[in-house]
Amino acid sequence: MAVGKNKRLSKGKKGLKKRTQDPFSRKDEYSVKAPSTFAIRDVGKTLVNRTTGLKNANDSLKGRIFEVSLADLQNDEDHAFRKVKLRVDEVQGKNCLTNFHGLDFTSDKLRSLVRKWQTLIEANVTVKTTDDYLLRLFAIAFTKRRPNQIKKTTYARSSQIRAIRKKITEIIQREASTRTLAQLTKLIPEVIGREIEKATHGIYPLQNVHIRKVKLLKSPKFDLGALLALHGESSTDDKGQKVEREFKEQVLESV
């Protein structure tokens, strides 16, 4: 008999599989809350690994970005083509408190707006709100037929396009620089577009005027009080109950 390892004996029994642990058993569920500027605040749920050792679940949640349809947040199907980005800034209990992080159009809506025989006019403006948020707003507009127009094309001259773009820039700058981020999020969906349409009617009639995208370039230093106010909560919630300073008295007694 040859001296050595018997390979057949060392093999395990056939059919036995390694026991695998369900990855979801190590996770916790947190609720995502939208700011009080929106009609519906419950965005949904998010999963995160439980706090183990030095890995804190709250640190994993902070900074997460969620993309939600504005129709769901405002309970209005007319806003279904707008997508809002919300960023988690603070975690309280099992709730993730979010703040506005940006806005965008769905690709199908943008494609449906572009048509033949009209001029597309675009403009982008970088503005700073009163609460020190630096934003870049992208506007889109299309020319339309004048009343009683027979010609099928509605092409604007380059001088008219420049004049319209200047008006768009002025209106966005005026509206955004005099408001907070929360006030601006209410105006973006419809109000600014309608105002641009009225102001530029004398230059060339416009249709489908929208703020198609909002990009957050820079945020101010994080302020918990401001975030809680945005969510309609007081900053004094449970703070006094959690902090205990009993160890100080023991030190004084020993001295």
From Swiss-Prot:
It comes from the Eukaryota. Coiled coil: none annotated. One of its GO terms (cellular component) is cytosolic small ribosomal subunit. It is found in: Cytoplasm. One of its GO terms (molecular function) is structural constituent of ribosome. Residues 1-18 have a biased composition (Basic residues). Residues 19-28 have a biased composition (Basic and acidic residues). Keywords: Acetylation, Cytoplasm, Ribonucleoprotein, Ribosomal protein. Component of the small ribosomal subunit. Mature ribosomes consist of a small (40S) and a large (60S) subunit. The 40S subunit contains about 33 different proteins and 1 molecule of RNA (18S). The 60S subunit contains about 49 different proteins and 3 molecules of RNA (25S, 5.8S and 5S). This is Small ribosomal subunit protein eS1. The keyword Cytoplasm applies. GO terms for biological process: translation. HAMAP family: Ribosomal_eS1_euk. The keyword Ribosomal protein applies. The modification N-acetylalanine is found at A2. Residues 1-28 are annotated as: Disordered. Its main location: cytoplasm. Belongs to the eukaryotic ribosomal protein eS1 family.
